[in-house]
Curated annotation (Swiss-Prot):
CDD domains: TGS_MJ1332_like, Ygr210. Belongs to the TRAFAC class OBG-HflX-like GTPase superfamily. OBG GTPase family. GO terms for cellular component: cytoplasm. The lineage of its organism: Archaea, Methanobacteriati, Methanobacteriota, Methanomada group, Methanococci. It comes from the Archaea. This is Uncharacterized GTP-binding protein MJ1332.
């Protein structure tokens, strides 16, 4: 399963965002996931469930459908707090780098209010643009330090074997960087690695970071009066990145209020359903929250995790079934499983994802919506419902 890392300096609301993402909605019970380490958790990306489109009542197993929206579990990691010099082991640098290594994409949480300095201490008028710059530099220098270890020896060997991609893949093993990423990063470089300069290697580290560790910027504490101008600065400075105004604190408050039976959430709004539990202070807080939701169209937290999977990691949702007429499995569960697969995945890829033997003995697949047969190379589309026909017993 792909994993998203939450990164940022101390006191920007990163842990609050982690808690907001991993706090289960009231309707989602306990699912039998593997034991999660303290800094790892299960969040839910959301996508329209095909049940409404098909006019059927679904019975999910690996996910949950709430008001026609499928909630699909994904893994997130709260990366150790970041301070300048982390790549040299400063602060919790080594822990930070180990956490970083595991993630496929990042949500960089910055304090859009400008009330915390580079170390996370209280201050006034700090520029969050600097937070993004120093984080990118830390990751670049970390990749660079791994890339250049025993570089002369590696470059000579790669030159002799005429396989720089394999040499780089071996050198960067453990960083979740695949061969395609490496090929893309070096395509404009000299074919002879022994000619690569220090500047070339630093630029290569930057390219590898951009390709293999894509990132969203969460402009957190967006409800603060000083945040708006900083959010605009972030958008202007980092045009190549998705910048999302967020309030993790508001998201967490709403989830907990819903869990307590005080409110019912609907899309990017909510209604109070138990007035007896609401005192005057809470009512003022709810009015404040409503104003924020109206201004930004939501808390931004769900948007961050959705965009991380659907935009950065290019994922789509597909539904494998065994009965193409009832859209069900053998037990009669309708639309039982929602699978996240890479855009460009084929029917055979899905078969392998369901079970290795299904992939090995794949015969053909059926597009259950259109009731047509498709081949092994059929490219899956978002919200496809697919029956796999295989010689597997």
């Amino acid at each position: 399963m792909a994993m998203i890392g939450l990164v940022g300096k101390p006191n920007v609301g990163k842990s609050t965002m982690f808690n907001a993402l991993t706090e289960k909605p009231a309707e989602i019970g306990n699912y039998p996931f593997t034991t999660i380490q303290p800094n790892k958790g299960i969040a839910y990306i959301t996508s329209p469930c095909p049940c409404k489109e098909l006019g059927v009542k679904c019975n999910p197993r690996n996910s949950k459908c709430i008001d026609g929206i499928r909630h699909i579990p994904v893994e997130v990691i709260d990366v150790a707090g970041l301070v300048p010099g982390a790549h040299e082991g400063r602060g919790m640098g080594n822990k930070f780098l180990d956490d970083l290594r595991q993630a496929d994409a990042f949500i960089l949480v910055v304090d859009a209010s400008g009330k915390t300095d580079a170390e996370g201490n209280p201050t006034e008028n700090y520029d969050p643009v600097e937070d993004v710059k120093f984080l990118l530099n830390e990751i670049d220098m970390w990749i660079y330090s791994i890339l250049t270890k025993n570089w002369d020896k590696l470059a000579r060997r790669a030159q002799q074997e005429k396989n720089i991609v394999k040499a780089l893949k071996d050198q960067l093993s453990g960083l979740n960087i695949d061969e395609d990423d490496i090929k893309m990063a070096i395509r404009d470089m000299d074919e002879s690695p022994i000619k690569w300069t220090e500047e070339d290697l630093l630029n290569l580290a930057k390219k590898l970071r951009k390709i293999s560790k894509p990132m969203i910027i969460a402009a957190n504490k967006a409800d603060h009066p000083d945040a708006e101008k900083n959010i605009e600065r972030l958008k202007k400075e980092f045009k190549d990145y998705i910048v999302i105004p967020t309030s993790a604190e508001i998201e967490l408050a709403l989830k907990r209020a819903e869990k307590a039976g005080i409110i019912k959430r609907k899309e990017n709004d909510f209604e109070i359903i138990d007035e007896s539990k609401v005192n005057e202070q809470m009512r003022r807080a709810f009015d404040y929250i409503k104003d924020f939701l109206k201004k930004y169209g939501g808390t931004g937290v769900q948007e961050c995790i959705n965009k991380a999977y659907f935009d950065l990691l290019d994922m789509i949702v597909v539904y494998p079934v065994e009965d193409e007429n009832k859209f069900s499995d053998k037990q009669g569960n309708v639309l039982p499983d929602a699978f996240l697969v890479k855009k460009g995945s084929t029917a055979r890829d899905l078969a392998y994802k369901v079970h290795t033997e299904l992939g090995e003995k794949f015969i053909y697949a059926i597009d259950a919506k259109k009731k047509i047969r498709v081949g092994a190379d059929y490219e899956l589309k978002h919200n496809d419902i697919i029956k796999i026909v295989s010689a597997a017993k």
